[in-house]
C-alpha cells in the first residue's frame, strides 16, 4: 500500500441499473461515470458498486441474505454471485475502455462474515493492486458466513469497512444527479443543490432527504 490514503468511489446499484427491470444496466450512466473517473485521475482509488436490478431480485427470490436453510438455495447463491459478476463486467468494460487500470476483486473470495457483518478480509491482493497503481473494483456479493452459512454483503458495508481499515482520505458517492439536493430534482424543479455540506448542516436537512 502506498503512503497516500486511498479514495473510495461508491457507485450505487440504483444508479447503474434500472431497478424497475431485471438485469437492466444503464450503460450510458456507467460509461459517463467511467469517463468522469478517468478525467479526475484520482490516485489510490478503490471502486465499489452495488447490485441494483442484477443482484437484488435473485438474492430476494432465494432468501440469500437470511442464510442457508435448504439445498434449493445453493443455486440461488451461485446465481446471485454470477449476475453480480455480469454487472461487474459491464463496469469493468467501461473503466478499462477509458484507460483506467481497473482490476476486479470478488468479495466472495476474500471476505468472510459472521451473522452478516464482516469478520475477516484477506487484503493481500487489494494492497498489492494499490501498491502497483491499479484500481481495485469490488461489489456487493454473496458471501460465506460463519453463523448463517452464507449471506449477502452489501456495497455499503464494504465501503464502510474499507474506509476504516485503510483510513480512506475521502469517500465519493457516484450518483445520477449533479450532487446532493434538498429534494428529488427529478420531481421537484426548484430543488436546491448543496455545493458544500458540513456534518451539522446535514443533520438539519436530513428530514428533507
Task: Identify what each model region corresponds to.
Residues 8-12, 48-49, 105-106, 137-139, ...:
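Short beta-strand segments
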Residues 1-46:
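N-terminal glycine-/serine-/threonine-rich phosphate-binding loop
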Residues 7, 44-45, 102-103, 168-171:
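Hydrophobic anchor at the start of a short beta-strand
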Residues 22, 52-68:
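Glycine-rich loop at the start of a catalytic domain that most often binds anionic cofactors/ligands
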Residues 63-142:
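Ligand-binding beta-strand-loop-alpha-helix segment within the catalytic cores
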Residues 89-91, 118-182:
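Internal active-site segments that recognize and position negatively charged phosphoryl groups
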Residues 15-17, 52-56, 110-113, 143-145, ...:
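Short, active-site-adjacent cap segments at secondary-structure transitions
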Residues 29-34, 75-92, 149-152, 157-159, ...:
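Polyanion-binding loop/helix "lid" in catalytic or ligand-binding cores
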